[in-house]
Amino acid sequence: MPESADPRDRLIVALDLPDVEAAERLVARIGDAATFYKIGYRLAYAGGLDFAARLAKSGKKTFLDLKLHDIGNTVEEGVRSASALGATFLTVHAYPQTMRAAVRGRGPGLKILAVTVLTSYDDADAAEAGYALPIADLVARRAEQAAEIGIDGIVCSAVEAGAVRHRIGPSGLIVTPGIRPAGAEAGDQKRVMTPGQARAAGIDHVVVGRPITGADDPRAVAQRIVAEMEDA
């Protein structure tokens, strides 16, 4: 399991906010309590990619959660563009052709993460979407394919982390959304753990959004999460 020199890197704050101004305010309030930020669709479509580049230039790490999935050439060129923004992580959907294209486009310093199954899904959702396998088996199969292709890490729920680690080995990254501090509401996440449980399960990075972004004191919440993982 890869270790970061800075324990704060294990926490990725999800900037699921409506505009860049709100994101800038939150980053300023958190200060040095966090070093790693995720930009997803909502912020990306509101100027968030330029903001991500500025964050990277300021010394922060950025995770572009864009979940690319398209024809190979489009994915490959999209990954090259993300590399130019100074991103640390970029997500693609864990389909073999998509993952191979992403590996071809990967530049220095960028790590590609494959999204296995969204953490808002349970087995009933997967069945409704037409998948024949239960989620645990689907995640394991996609993780194994990702490792064979050369993907840097896997995005999965904490519940599947052990099975994923078995398939990607000790050097692969496991990044987990759906993390909620003790006492926080699960929201639309269906497969959740606390930060301490996630760290004990061998997860490298946890993604936390609303418990931080909606807090009266987001800096303090970020500090507590980092401390909880340190103590696990």
Curated annotation (Swiss-Prot):
It holds the Pfam family OMPdecase. Keywords: Decarboxylase, Lyase, Pyrimidine biosynthesis. NCBIfam families: PRK00230.1, pyrF. Homodimer. Catalyzes the decarboxylation of orotidine 5'-monophosphate (OMP) to uridine 5'-monophosphate (UMP). Belongs to the OMP decarboxylase family. Type 1 subfamily. This is Orotidine 5'-phosphate decarboxylase. It comes from Methylorubrum extorquens (strain PA1) (Methylobacterium extorquens). The lineage of its organism: Bacteria, Pseudomonadati, Pseudomonadota, Alphaproteobacteria, Hyphomicrobiales.
